Curated annotation (Swiss-Prot):
Name of the protein described by the UniProt record: Protein btn1
GO CC annotations on file: fungal-type vacuole; vacuolar membrane; vacuole
Species name: Aspergillus fumigatus (strain ATCC MYA-4609 / CBS 101355 / FGSC A1100 / Af293) (Neosartorya fumigata)
The protein's role, per its UniProt record: Involved in vacuolar transport and vacuole pH homeostasis. Also required for cytokinesis.
InterPro entries in the cross-refs: Battenin_disease_Cln3, Battenin_disease_Cln3_subgr, MFS_trans_sf
Subcellular location: Vacuole membrane
SUPFAM superfamilies membership: MFS general substrate transporter
Membrane topology note: Multi-pass membrane protein
Family: Belongs to the battenin family.
Listed transmembrane segments: 42-62, 76-96, 105-125, 135-155, 164-184, 195-215, 287-307, 323-343, 356-376, 378-398, 428-448
BP GO terms, sorted: L-arginine transmembrane transport; lysine transport; regulation of intracellular pH
Coiled coil: none
Keyword Transmembrane helix: yes
Keywords, alphabetical: Amino-acid transport, Membrane, Transmembrane, Transmembrane helix, Transport, Vacuole
């Protein structure tokens, strides 16, 4: 009986009614228990990975108008910022395991810094410059962001669930920090766009410090033989046996021609093993699609269609809103959305969901509801829209971070690193689809509103 009582006391539960000091002490104790076993260095490193890897993406989108001018659709910047990342996430999981993590970090930092320098140093459109150089810089930064996400998410496999929670929180903070820092630098501090972007090009160096100086390296030692890649332990043993057989002592009667023939057979078997590994990885992806990749894809299509195609048309008369200008609505929506994303992406130590489709379908309902509002204008107050946008951010962040948490729980250990990296393609694919849809959808919604007597979208 005493043992049972001890067990019950160890189970987390809500504080019982009583003295406030006692309840607060119990709450603090259980709060600390949630983080039992967390390595502060791991959490700090992965939080910085998430922040820096995503913050340049946000800075570029925040600077879209300044980068390409008013005559070029901002969707061009979005697509240049997303399509290379999508291509990287689609292709790289099948070969990036051959590149050691330290080398990847150096490559990503170089691409990010070079991309931001190209964007910052190319002449502005007002001085006769073209946007081609700026778009090239955005593409380089996007390649780095895509490769960084699939690598860092895969890296969480070796550092446990707290690394994933820290990564998710860092990516959520990137939206707030990126948009806020750009607005602060260019408005409150009065810095030029060029100076702000030049300062941003120094941020990737933080990833070098985080990886080589903050992150404990011991969990990576077992995978120092990078050529082994994603292969299961059993397969590695089989390959070792094959190599031992093929490279073992040969009979003294073998002549040079037979040795060359043996080397040719080994090469052919190596190529065959590579092809078999590729086909096995494709089979893994098919197994990931419905439980993990599809709900993440759906939530991102709905989320970014709202952000890029619908929310620019969710406008109210100025005398019924807290704003003095119509162009203030969109930044306010974006800030509220980013707060929701940050909260939900930081939530896995406290709250987990296992049904990934439920929040995805709720996000689709958000898209339908806000589209109907843009068309029929039946919601009486902008403050209700604020609540829906905040809810949108919560749902999107929940699906993102819980998708990878579920992979960590449900996918076999030997397949986990590949599965985590391969699934990152879903968010980029969703953003790409939403980018193309939004370029048409926003125009259609605005035209509808104008023809029905609401021309607010033309006054921005």
């Amino acid at each position: 009986m005493p043992a049972a009582a001890d067990t019950e006391e160890e189970q987390p539960m809500l504080p019982l009614p009583g003295a406030p000091s006692s309840s607060w002490a119990q709450f603090c104790q259980r709060f600390r228990a949630l983080f039992s076993g967390a390595d502060p260095r791991v959490c700090v490193a992965f939080w910085l990975f998430g922040l820096i890897n995503n913050v340049l993406y946000v800075v570029i989108l925040s600077a879209a108008l300044d980068l390409v001018g008013p005559s070029v659709p901002k969707g061009v910047v979005l697509l240049a910022d997303v399509i290379p990342s999508f291509a990287t996430k689609l292709i790289a999981p099948y070969f990036i395991h051959m590149v050691p993590y330290p080398v990847r970090i150096i490559i990503f930092v170089f691409l990010s810094a070079a991309g931001m320098l190209l964007v910052a140093l190319s002449p502005p459109y007002t001085d006769g410059g073209t946007i081609a150089t700026k778009l090239a810089g955005i593409v380089l930064a996007s390649l780095s962001s895509g490769g960084g996400e699939l690598s860092f998410v895969g890296l969480t496999h070796f550092y446990g669930p707290f690394s994933l929670a820290a990564w998710g929180s860092g990516t959520g903070a990137a939206g707030l920090v990126g948009a806020g820092a750009y607005a602060l630098a260019t408005t409150s501090l009065g810095l030029s766009v060029k100076a702000t972007l030049l300062a941003s090009s120094c941020l990737p160096a933080v990833m070098v410090v985080s990886f080589f100086m903050v992150l404990p390296r011991s969990p990576l030692q077992p995978i120092s033989a990078a050529y082994a890649g994603y292969r299961a332990v059993e397969e590695r043993e089989e390959l070792a046996e094959e190599r031992e057989f093929m490279e073992g002592d040969r009979d003294a009667t073998f002549d040079e021609q037979e040795r060359l023939l043996g080397a040719s057979v080994l090469s052919d078997q190596s190529k065959k093993a590579g092809w078999q590994r590729f086909k096995r990885d494709l089979k893994r992806v098919r197994g990931l699609f419905f439980p993990f990749m599809l709900p993440l894809l759906l939530v991102y299509v709905a989320e970014y269609t709202i952000n890029q195609g619908v929310s620019p048309t969710l406008l109210f008369p100025l005398d019924e809103s807290p704003f003095a200008h119509f162009r203030a609505f969109y930044p306010a929506y974006n800030a509220i959305y980013q707060v929701g994303v940050f909260i939900s992406r930081s939530s896995t130590p406290f709250f987990r969901i296992h049904d990934l489709y439920l929040p995805s379908f709720l996000q689709i309902l958000n898209l339908v509801l806000l589209t109907l509002q843009a068309v029929f204008n039946f919601i009486p107050s902008v403050y209700i829209i604020f609540i829906i946008i905040f809810w949108e951010g919560l749902l999107g962040g929940l699906v993102y971070v819980n998708t990878f948490a579920e992979i960590g729980d449900r996918v076999p250990k030997e397949d986990r690193e590949f599965s985590l990296g391969a699934t990152t393609v879903s968010d980029a694919a969703g953003i790409c689809i939403a980018g193309f849809v939004s370029m048409v959808f926003e125009v259609w919604l605005c035209d509808w509103q104008v023809t029905h007597g609401r021309d607010y979208c033309r006054r921005i």
